[in-house]
């Protein structure tokens, strides 16, 4: 099996249509990633009329179809490219490039695929410059899915503090913690907007004793549904040696917001869950105790208590806190969350040496 740097470089160069890089297993993969993508020339498409775009030089014919979904910043359309169907993501505002976001999502997909989790992030297939839309990108269509918020609404036993509710939440957190641990460790990446609506659940594809091997450890997952991480519109990568930011999908907060930042992503999804009174009221004392432990930052502030008292529906206070240059999620690092769940919920997650 290729080492992770060779695997990552090969698949990225295939996308870029550049000669493969012959490299050893280096530790500073984010810098390699950044250097490979900075010189990429995005193909410019010509509008042929009626939503049809083409570029002879890039051998692309793209037909924009119906709108699939609309978020705060982006719009998803269905599209057909050379006879295959994808999502096409564009910014809601004209002349806003999604080039950085596209590459960050592509990089996340490649590295998680190396660890036997190709479903974890939808693959990016084309990055193109479309008239009136600027740089957009196509990606895999995720079928038979629901956001995790909707998944909880349909499967939680509300207002009943039971182990079944705990397990549903812990299954998701284990998957996300593994994704984030890999992205931070290998790509120096933070998602920076990890919340309930940016996680899709595919119930038709459960995980049964699914094994992921990372640096001499074998992680085994069991879950009633697979988690898919989406929307890299605020993601960033940083140099693992200097800790300096290299690339951001958004300029928001990047001047002081170092990347990666320990515990940041998992802290946000935990706060997003705990901020919902119905969720707090449907977890057992054991699960609540873990949330209270995880939601303490490096200043000693207990955000579980703060969120239970203060109404913050958009989590503005939490975003402000985690984007501060000195923030650390001391108890919400992926490794600590995985260890706590392994010790508290037998069968959801296990860890072995190999």
Predicted segment positions?
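Conserved kinase catalytic-core helix
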Residues: 158-192, 196-197, 205-206
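Helical subdomain adjoining the active site within ATP-dependent kinase catalytic cores
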Residues: 2-29, 253-354
């Amino acid at each position: 099996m290729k080492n992770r740097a060779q695997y990552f470089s090969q698949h990225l160069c295939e996308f870029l249509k550049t000669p493969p890089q012959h490299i050893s297993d280096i530790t500073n993969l984010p810098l390699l990633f950044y250097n490979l993508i900075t010189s990429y020339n995005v193909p410019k498409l010509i509008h042929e009329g009626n939503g049809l775009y083409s570029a002879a030089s890039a051998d692309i014919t793209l037909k924009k179809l119906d709108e699939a979904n609309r978020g705060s910043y982006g719009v998803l359309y269905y599209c057909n490219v050379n006879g295959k169907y994808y999502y096409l993501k564009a910014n809601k505002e004209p002349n806003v490039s999604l080039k950085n976001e596209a590459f960050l999502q592509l990089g996340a997909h490649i590295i998680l695929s190396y660890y036997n989790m190709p479903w974890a992030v939808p693959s990016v297939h084309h990055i193109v410059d479309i008239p009136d839309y600027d740089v957009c990108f196509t990606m895999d269509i995720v079928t038979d899915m629901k956001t995790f918020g909707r998944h909880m609404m349909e499967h939680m036993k509300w207002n009943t503090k039971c182990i079944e509710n705990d397990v549903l939440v812990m299954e998701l957190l284990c998957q996300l913690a593994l994704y984030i641990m890999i992205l931070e460790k290998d790509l120096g990446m933070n998602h920076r907007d990890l919340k309930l609506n940016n996680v899709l659940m595919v119930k038709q594809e459960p995980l049964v004793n699914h094994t992921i091997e990372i640096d001499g450890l074998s992680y085994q997952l069991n879950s009633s549904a697979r988690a898919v991480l989406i929307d890299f519109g605020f993601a960033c990568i940083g140099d693992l040696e200097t800790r300096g930011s290299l690339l951001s999908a958004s300029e928001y907060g990047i001047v002081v917001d170092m990347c990666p930042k320990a515990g940041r992503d998992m802290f946000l999804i935990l706060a997003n869950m705990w901020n919902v009174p119905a969720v707090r009221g449907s977890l057992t004392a054991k699960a609540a105790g873990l949330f209270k432990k995880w939601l303490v930052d490096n200043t000693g502030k207990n955000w579980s208590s703060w969120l239970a008292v203060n109404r913050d529906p958009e989590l503005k206070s939490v975003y402000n806190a985690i984007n501060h240059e000195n923030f650390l999620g001391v108890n919400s690092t992926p490794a600590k969350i995985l260890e706590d769940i392994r010790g508290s919920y037998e069968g959801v997650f296990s860890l072995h040496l190999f």
